[in-house]
From Swiss-Prot:
One of the primary rRNA binding proteins, it binds directly to 16S rRNA where it nucleates assembly of the head domain of the 30S subunit. Is located at the subunit interface close to the decoding center, probably blocks exit of the E-site tRNA. Belongs to the universal ribosomal protein uS7 family. One of its GO terms (molecular function) is structural constituent of ribosome. CDD domains: uS7_Bacteria. The gene is rpsG. It comes from Bartonella quintana (strain Toulouse). The keyword 4Fe-4S does not apply. GO terms for cellular component: small ribosomal subunit. This is Small ribosomal subunit protein uS7.
């Protein structure tokens, strides 16, 4: 790990359509090879599909989906006297959001709808209703932390 000063956080502009920073971060995570326009088309298309199916504000549903996927606790490996323990620790708010975004995108890419727009829309609606692969991932992480609660005194 570098001993120099910590890198400064870059200023991110809100997305042009909804004016939401989290949606911008989501777009940046979906983006491949710097193709922001493709990522915008996917995210905005998915939010339009969600709006047409649910008949409510897609941004509220998006934030609800992120909140349902974000983990509160996770396990980290800690080496103590030759043994490696999975120690449950709380997740920082910025990491919570980053993990939720990553898991939502991975789950959407793993679905079998025809286009990425439909896959992402389906995963967002499932996550908002506490279903889907991304929510299952969060529950697995929570279950793992619960199973290793005995090692929580190794927390650092």
């Amino acid at each position: 790990m570098s001993r120099r000063h910590r890198a400064e956080k870059r200023e991110i502009n809100p997305d042009p359509k909804f004016g939401d920073l989290v949606i911008t971060k989501f777009m940046n995570a979906i983006m491949f090879d710097g193709k922001k326009s493709v990522a915008e088309r996917i995210v905005y298309g998915a939010l339009d599909v969600v709006e047409s199916k649910v008949k409510s504000d897609p941004v509220v549903l998006f934030h609800q989906a992120l909140e349902n996927v974000a983990p509160h606790i996770e396990v980290r490996s800690r080496r103590v006297g030759g043994a490696t323990y999975q120690v449950p620790v709380d997740v920082r708010p910025d990491r919570r959001r980053a993990l939720a975004v990553r898991w939502l995108i991975t789950a959407a890419r793993g679905r079998n709808e025809t286009t990425m727009i439909n896959r992402l829309a389906g995963e967002l609606m499932d996550a908002a209703n506490n279903r889907g692969s991304a929510v299952k991932k969060r529950e697995d992480v929570h279950r793992m932390a619960e199973a290793n609660r005995a090692f929580s005194h190794y927390r650092w």
